[in-house]
């Protein structure tokens, strides 16, 4: 249970960190969409381990194989299956964790729930599960781009106490990809990289915040009450490994303002469209997109698996210590950027199909 996301654009991920491979089955993708392995690979390469000195040194090519659902470079409308094979698992590094629980990791809770767990690499709780999401997200991005020219860009906003000043309305993908930490502010990025280098040498970890903007999102996506667009975005982001917080628009900072200070006042633009003079709502009002840029932030905790010795317990209830071995990210933020983008794309694509199914058909009634 809990391995499927979405209502009409449905993705089901599978696989474990040290198993034969990981992947995704996508159901509900419209037919005749032009898509290639190379397009999907672009985002997978941004997510893969071993890409720089500030991420896990595990070496995986993460080459995707499209198993079904695509023919002659176009989607068939049938389920799309994508597989990425694991090649560089070193399960012996985890032998100690077969008995000892890693503090703040999923080891103890998986054991409590199922009575059994795959301790090699964390199994399903590993961030390798997100390979399937990123692959599906690449297809969702293509749909959104093809229909409404929607552009989704994520970037590292903050690491520990180093926060970058970034304009989400103008930031570009080239700026994000200009350095290994994926912070488009070069001066702050250099400080972030130096901090991660030091944390890695200390055998410790740090967290931070990924901000993500979706531009050109049409009005009308999202549904009242339980399926509000921001509610589904929050679910998507909070389902990512290591995520601990979600904000949209003004977020928690908005609680310091009065209503007159916080409200986004309306005006009519040169095209006769209703617009807002500010965007503290983050592009969503009443759970429905208003046509402004959707701006969200996701907080990620410090990586739980660290080389520093910490107190823990064994499966049999004995107190002990653990200094984790294995290859792990000292900071998940650089590789979390494409994961956040993917979840944004999956939510928007699913709601776009729902909007088309419910609201555009009514045009035929009049």
UniProtKB/Swiss-Prot annotation:
Which GO cellular component terms are attached? cytosol
Q: Does the keyword DNA damage apply?
A: no
The pathway is: Metabolic intermediate biosynthesis; chorismate biosynthesis; chorismate from D-erythrose 4-phosphate and phosphoenolpyruvate: step 7/7
Q: Name one GO molecular function term.
A: FMN binding
Q: CDD domains attached here?
A: Chorismate_synthase
Q: Give the EC number(s) under which this enzyme is classified.
A: 4.2.3.5
State the Gene3D superfamilies in the record.
Chorismate synthase AroC (3.60.150.10)
Q: Which reaction does it catalyse?
A: 5-O-(1-carboxyvinyl)-3-phosphoshikimate = chorismate + phosphate
User: What protein does this entry describe?
Assistant: Chorismate synthase
Q: Which PROSITE patterns does this entry report, sorted A to Z?
A: CHORISMATE_SYNTHASE_1, CHORISMATE_SYNTHASE_2, CHORISMATE_SYNTHASE_3
Q: Keywords in UniProt for this one? A: Amino-acid biosynthesis, Aromatic amino acid biosynthesis, FAD, Flavoprotein, FMN, Lyase, NADP
Q: What protein family does this chain belong to?
A: Belongs to the chorismate synthase family.
Q: Which HAMAP family match?
A: Chorismate_synth
Question: What does the UniProt record say this protein does?
Answer: This reaction introduces a second double bond into the aromatic ring system.
Cofactor entry: FMNH2
| Leading EC class | lyase
Q: Which residues bind FMN?
A: 124-126, 286, 301-305, 327
Q: How is the subunit organization of this protein annotated in UniProt?
A: Homotetramer.
Write down how the cofactor binds this protein. Answer: Reduced FMN (FMNH(2)).
Which residues participate in NADP(+) binding?
Answer: 47, 53
Gene that this polypeptide is encoded by: aroC
Q: Name one GO biological process term.
A: aromatic amino acid family biosynthetic process
- What is the scientific name of the source organism? Microcystis aeruginosa (strain NIES-843 / IAM M-2473)
């Amino acid at each position: 249970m809990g391995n499927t996301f979405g209502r009409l654009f449905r993705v089901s991920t599978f696989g474990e960190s040290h198993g034969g491979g990981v992947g995704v089955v996508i159901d509900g993708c419209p037919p005749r969409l032009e898509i290639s392995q190379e397009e999907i690979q672009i985002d997978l390469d941004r997510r893969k381990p071993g890409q720089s000195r500030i991420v896990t040194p595990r070496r995986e090519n993460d080459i995707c194989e499209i198993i079904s659902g695509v023919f002659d470079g176009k989607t068939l409308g049938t389920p799309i299956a994508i597989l990425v094979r694991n090649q560089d698992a070193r399960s012996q590094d985890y032998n100690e964790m077969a008995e000892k629980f890693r503090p703040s990791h999923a080891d103890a809770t998986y054991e409590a729930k199922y009575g059994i767990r795959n301790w090699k690499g964390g199994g399903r709780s590993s961030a390798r599960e997100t390979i399937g999401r990123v692959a599906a997200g690449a297809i969702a991005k293509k749909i959104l781009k093809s229909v409404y020219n929607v552009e989704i860009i994520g970037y590292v906003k903050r690491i520990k106490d180093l926060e970058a000043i970034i304009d989400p309305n103008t930031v570009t993908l080239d700026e994000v990809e200009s350095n290994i930490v994926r912070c488009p502010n070069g001066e702050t990025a250099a400080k972030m990289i130096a901090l991660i280098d030091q944390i890695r040498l200390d055998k410790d970890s740090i967290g931070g915040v990924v901000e993500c903007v979706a531009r050109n999102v049409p009005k009308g996506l999202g549904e009242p009450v339980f399926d509000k667009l921001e509610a589904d975005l929050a679910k998507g982001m909070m389902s990512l490994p290591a995520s601990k917080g979600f904000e949209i628009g003004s977020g928690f900072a908005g609680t310091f303002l009065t209503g007159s200070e916080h409200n986004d006042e309306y005006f009519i633009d040169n095209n006769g469209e209703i617009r807002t003079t500010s965007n503290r709502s983050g592009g969503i009002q009443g759970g429905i997109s208003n046509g402004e840029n959707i701006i969200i932030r996701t907080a990620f905790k410090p990586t739980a698996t660290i080389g520093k010795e910490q107190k823990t317990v064994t499966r049999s209830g004995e107190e002990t210590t653990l200094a984790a071995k294995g290859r792990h990210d000292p900071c998940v933020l650089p590789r979390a950027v494409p994961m956040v983008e993917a979840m944004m794309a999956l939510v928007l694509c699913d709601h776009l199909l729902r909007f088309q199914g419910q609201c555009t058909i009514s045009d035929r009634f009049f």
